Every structure is written in structure tokens, then in C-alpha cells.
């Protein structure tokens, strides 16, 4: 139960792990709102498909996973999470599609690298995960050229992260992605838009190149783990893992001093009185039991509650599945208030 801003007592879900967010960039655009809601103790999440609202309580929250292309606006607020004993880490997408204009509202590559480094120095490189995601080709952007861009960004990030996560763009599966790639770029037509997805030969070239880059960096003293996000292909022969973006194993390792949270990650119970639960021999849960059933089959994420909303991210990335069109995003942005209980009033 939570008491709303209007004094009503309502039912609320009480997640232990919050995802902020797969659906929009909360750190970049809605940091003030997020911390206002944290202070209030709850937020409202609206299901865009059935328009139903869910109240989300922060009472039991022990960890937040942030997804962003620009963490700079949220950095001045992070001390509030530390003071509340709420753990956090970041998934930071740092691509270089400047020449193609695929990400029109993100800062320059150089500025994003500088912010990435500052955040890594502030909270530790194991809590700042680099994503080059998704991987897209065009008639003028080949896998070899993509690899060179990844090398350039990686050389700037060397030693500031432990992991690189990547995926291949999904175009055929998303009508709105196809429409936006045609409408908002000069790279594709309706007839050619699906060529943004790599062929098997192109994927092989890219994967082999990434593995070679990793080995090159390892020789230079940078041990970087490679992992795919939401990809069914088994790349174990290349030493490439299936990623868990909401990652219980990472959290157990990085936040090991929080015994109650580690206990939750192993058993699914966040004990108010741990000794009482131990009397019943709480069993460890497998990764399969922990899987977030609301995500794609190939997704390895554990259970969490996402509090974002589609059609609210103003980066306007042309490949994004979370935005239908820019006009809708602008209309939604006009309805946002940092003082409301939901992202959109």
C-alpha cells in the first residue's frame, strides 16, 4: 500500500529491483522526476497497451538498474541512492552513428566518453557497462567500418569498464522501426530497409572482429568481457557470453556486503527477520527460475519492475522500438511534470 500525493491509500507492487528503463532514458531526460518520486516513496507506471496504471512502491527497493545514453543529468543525484542504501549500476549505450545521424539528440562521442569516464571513476568500472547497441549496416557502413568505430570508442574507454554488450538491429520484426529508418534517414527506402540487418556473413565478420579486438585489448592489459543482448545465437566458440542486463550474479559480486540483498538474489526472499526464514531452509533459485517472463525468450534478465514509458525519449534514435514517431514524443514531453507521480500527467 502507498499513500498517494492526493492522500488516497492504494494497492502497490513493491519490487526489490527497479529497471529505469528499457522504455525510455530516465537518467538523460527524467532524473528530477525519478528522485522526486523516490522521496515520495512511489511512482505510477502506465501500461501503454491497455492504459492501466500500476502504483510502484519504493519501500522494498534495494537496487536500480539504469539504462541510458547520457548519464550526466543524473550524476548530481546519485548520493541520494547511496544515503538510502539503494544499490545501482548503469547500462550505457555509447555508439558512434554520428555520420549517419541515427542518434540526433545525443551529445558528441567525445563528451559521452568523458561523462562515462567520470561516472566510472565515481562508482567503479564494474558498475558501468558499455553497450554498442544495436549494430546496423547501411550501403555505406560496412562491418569493417563498424569495427573501426568500436575500436576507436574502446580505445577511449580502455580501463573504465569491464564489459561490452552488443546486439544486432531488429528491423523486420518492428514496423515502426522500418518506417522510422525510411522516414528519418537517407540510407534506406521501403524496399531496402531490411538490409539494415546484417547477413550471416556480415555477422560472422563482425563477431570475429570483436573477438580479435578483445584479444588485442587483453594483450594491452584490458580484460574486457564480450556479451550479446537478446540474441539466440550461441557465440561461445568466440568466448562471447549471453548477457544478463539485470544481472543477479553481478549484483551479488559487487554488492556482496549487503547480506540481506544477496540473500534475496539467491532465494527470492528479502527477509525482514532473516533468521526466521533460515529456519525453513530457503533454497537457492536457478537462473531459469529468476528469468523475467515479460521479456523476450533470448533475454537473460532476472525479474525487475520497469518504470519507464514508451514514446517519451527525446534522443529520437531512428532504430528505437520504444518510440512510434517524434511528434507523439513531443506531445508526451509537453505533458510531463517532474512533480507528477507518473512520467506523463
Task: Spell out what each predicted region is.
Residues 1-103, 109-125, 324-345:
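Conserved Radical SAM active-site core
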Residues 23-25, 69, 93-97, 133-135, ...:
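Active-site beta-loop-alpha junctions enriched in small/polar residues
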Residues 98-106, 134-144, 189-201:
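Surface-exposed cleft-lining segments at the edges of enzyme active sites
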Residues 100, 138-140, 163-194, 229-243:
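Flexible glycine/acidic-rich beta-alpha junction loops that bind and position SAM and/or redox cofactors
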Residues 111-177, 209-230:
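Conserved C-terminal portion of the radical SAM core fold
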Residues 197-297:
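A C-terminal junction/extension of Radical SAM enzymes
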Residues 231-246, 315-320, 324-345:
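C-terminal/domain-terminus segments
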Residues 297-324:
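Local cysteine-cluster metal-coordination motifs and their immediate loop/turn environment
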Amino acid at each position: 500500500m502507498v499513500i498517494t500525493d492526493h492522500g488516497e491509500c492504494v494497492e502497490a507492487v513493491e519490487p526489490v529491483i527497479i529497471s529505469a528503463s528499457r522504455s525510455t532514458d530516465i537518467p538523460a531526460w527524467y532524473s528530477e522526476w525519478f528522485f522526486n518520486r523516490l522521496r515520495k516513496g512511489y511512482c505510477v507506471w502506465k501500461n501503454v497497451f491497455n492504459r492501466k496504471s500500476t502504483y510502484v512502491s519504493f519501500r522494498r527497493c534495494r537496487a536500480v538498474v539504469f539504462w541510458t545514453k547520457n548519464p550526466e543529468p543524473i550524476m548530481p543525484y546519485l548520493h541520494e541512492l547511496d544515503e538510502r542504501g539503494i544499490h545501482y549500476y548503469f547500462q550505457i549505450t555509447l555508439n558512434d552513428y554520428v555520420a549517419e545521424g541515427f542518434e540526433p539528440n545525443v551529445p558528441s562521442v567525445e563528451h559521452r566518453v568523458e561523462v562515462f569516464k567520470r561516472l566510472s571513476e565515481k562508482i567503479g568500472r564494474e558498475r558501468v557497462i558499455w553497450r554498442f547497441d544495436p549494430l546496423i549496416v547501411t550501403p555505406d557502413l560496412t562491418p569493417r567500418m563498424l569495427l573501426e568505430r568500436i575500436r576507436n570508442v574502446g580505445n577511449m574507454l580502455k580501463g573504465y569498464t569491464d564489459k561490452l554488450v552488443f546486439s544486432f538491429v531488429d528491423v523486420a520484426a518492428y514496423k515502426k522501426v522500418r518506417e522510422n529508418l525510411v522516414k528519418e534517414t537517407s540510407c534506406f527506402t521501403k524496399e531496402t530497409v531490411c538490409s539494415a540487418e546484417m547477413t550471416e556473413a556480415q555477422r560472422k565478420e563482425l563477431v570475429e572482429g570483436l573477438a580479435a579486438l578483445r584479444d588485442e585489448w587483453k594483450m594491452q592489459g584490458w580484460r574486457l568481457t564480450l556479451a550479446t543482448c537478446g540474441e539466440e545465437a550461441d557465440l561461445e566458440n568466440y568466448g562471447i557470453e549471453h548477457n544478463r542486463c539485470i544481472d543477479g550474479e553481478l549484483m551479488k559480486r559487487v554488492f556482496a556486503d549487503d547480506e540481506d540483498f544477496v540473500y534475496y538474489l539467491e532465494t527470492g526472499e528479502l527477509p525482514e527477520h532473516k533468521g526466521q526464514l533460515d529456519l525453513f531452509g530457503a533454497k537457492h533459485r536457478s537462473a531459469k527460475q529468476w528469468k523475467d517472463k515479460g521479456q523476450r525468450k533470448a533475454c537473460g534478465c532476472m525479474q525487475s519492475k520497469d518504470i519507464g514509458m514508451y514514446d517519451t525519449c527525446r534522443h529520437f534514435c531512428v532504430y528505437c522500438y520504444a518510440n512510434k514517431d517524434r511528434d507523439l514524443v513531443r506531445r508526451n514531453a509537453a505533458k510531463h511534470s517532474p512533480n507528477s507521480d507518473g512520467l506523463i500527467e
